[in-house]
Curated annotation (Swiss-Prot):
Name of protein: G protein-coupled receptor associated sorting protein 3
Ranges annotated as biased composition (Basic residues): 1-10
Assembly and binders: Homodimer.
Gene Ontology CC: one annotated term: nucleus
Composition-biased stretches (Basic and acidic residues): 66-80, 88-106
Leader sequence segment: none
Amino acid sequence: MTGSKNKARAQAKLEKRASAQAKAAAEREAANAGRGAGKNRDKGKGKAGSKTDAVAEAKAGSKSKVVAETKEGARPESKAVAKGTSDFNHKAENKYARSARKDKPSSDSWFWAGEDSGINSWFWKGEEVSNNSVAKCENKPSTSIQARVEEHTPRTSHKSRSGAEEEEEENVIGNWFWEGDDTGFDSDPKPVFKIVKPQPVDEINEKDRPKDWSEVTIWPKAPAVTPAVLGYRSQDSSEGRPSSYIVLASNEEETSTTCTKNTRSSLQPIPEYPFGSDPCIQTLDEIRQQIKIREENGIKPFACPCKMECYLDSPEFEKLVNILKSTTDPLIHKIAQIAMGIHKVHPFAQEFINEVGVVTLIESLLSFSSPEVSIKKAVITLNSSGDDRQQMVEFHVKHMCKETVSFPLNSPGQQSGLKIIGQLTTESVHHYIVVSYFSELFHLLSQGNRKTRNLVLKVFLNMSENPKAARDMINMKALAALKLIFNQKEAKANLVSAVAIFINIKEHIRKGSIVVVDHLSYNTLTAIFREVKGIIERM
């Protein structure tokens, strides 16, 4: 009795479950149909209902599982019921559903099948709706078989659709990126390069080139602004002057030549000057005034910054002006400008001119400047007699001695002249000419500076080797000047030269080349030699 009651209860429960399952199946079909028609809201509700029903049935099935296990013969029947349940799901027939759901194991198989097809399909379908992929199902018939196939294969469809979505996103982003790139950049850019302007090249005109060396000129043309150049403006020599000849006029002549300078300035360009010098416009009177101020006050009032130091004094300047009045040679005028400090040149050039002596140098150039004089000199040198050559040499030595003693004391011109005289006195044939200037040379020895004394002592040393010249050196004035050399402040070279001079004179007296007749002079000479010997020993 009790067993029949339990069986009746179990059967009632099964019928109740079958009705619930039929209701759930109908709701699922309605949900599938609504999804095919594009009703997303109804589909969500159907899925939620099916899910709750499946959970409720799972709870009921777990309670009746104990009763169903007592029936061992129900397993083959459960297989048939499970098969019928699947057929019912595919065909949607209620008759087969009621007979097939009388066994307990069929509920379990339906539950797990429903869970796989319901929950998974709900999960993946929801994502498909978010990705706008439901439109593919609208063109197909809404059947339960197609819906079931879609529910059993959610992962494959997700993978394929997600790949399509990635490709679509890549296409969208890529198209936007490259379209922006195309609009931002030129598809056919032009090359960027720098235009280098070629430098103009001066073409050489073959017609203007000189055909012979005689057409080549070294000195430039005269500038438009006349710089300070010494010279004499003769009326008939303007046509025969070279192009580089420039005139320096005095104050009286400046007013008369202003119009001529203005006319030339509009016709001739200003060229560069030789020696790397710059012009300095000054008149003869201005230079004279500057020399006078320097001699009176001992200063150099050069207002122009391009001027260099001028070593000329008033007599030498006037002599230079008188010499330049007789010539139009541009080289001589340029040397005069450098000597006067009018042109700023390399210090070596000015030092050379000052040491040689500008007057001496210009006179030497004037003596051999013209080609006729040079040819005549060569003929005389080769074919003339010894008397003519000797006369020329004597004239040169006399001229150098005269120029040297006429220079200011310790001036560069004087020192240059002493150097030349020292070279000329290496031969004894010229000593008799220099002897006539002994008094002036001894004055330079006693009054000159250290360099001047050194040059004078070299001249005396050369002449002391000649007995005839040494005899003229034995007098009180000469020996007193030589004795002044021996002091503690004198240069060593000067002391050596002075000692050598005394030794040469002593040797001439000892050998008898020099005979002293006057006893007073001999005693004086002996006393001087003993005094000098004592000074040398003490030093």
